[in-house]
Amino acid sequence: MRRGWLLFLFLLLAVACGRDDVILHGETTMADIRDGVLVTDNGLTYHIAEDRTSSEWKSWQRTFVTCDILRQRSDKAFDIRLTEAHSVLRKEPVPEGAVPDETLGDDPVQITAGWVSGGYLNLMLRVVYRPEDEPHLINLVRLPDEDGTVRFRLRHNSHGDYYGAPGVEPPLSFGLSYVSFPVPADLPAADGLAGVPVEIRYRWHLTDGNGNLLPETEEKSLTGRIPR
């Protein structure tokens, strides 16, 4: 019996010694980068205690990260283990007519997700790309408001690197990217607690019956509300 208790105690000690002392695993968040510290969209401050990425995140303005929360420093400050970091393009929306059409482009781009946080309109985008080509340009053009709805058009200049362009044929390579646009300060009055209606128009490919992309494109839109 004593031997059994000793074995049980040994197992408890082994589990305790091997336990990863982490408050939360796999936290994901958008954050601004300020002097090597992450300031998340919900107002928390993350200090990087361990960096397990090979990214150059310190040179970025904004990032989408996956991390483990290790320790709490204060009410809203934590030490974290950084496990994954993606660069997020931070860019101001441009007024309609402020940038020439040939610079903006109108090539296909897909909005796969969109949400508002941290004072930003955040978009996850998908484009067809070839790694050897020059970087694509993304802009969010502010259109005139219509019936209380804030209207935008997402513009994409691929410099000829899109499906349907000469030399761009299947199999295709796709790139996912994150872009954050500061929410404009001159929004119309909100409709009660529901927020301000918003519409983002963009152009993306048609698909066949099996879900495969076709070279032809169509107008699409993402709608939602911006909290006030």
Language-model features and meaning:
Residues 111-169:
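Short helix-loop boundary/capping segments
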Residues 159-205:
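Short, solvent-exposed, Trp/other aromatic-anchored flexible loops in extracytoplasmic proteins
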Residues 208-228:
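Short beta-strand elements
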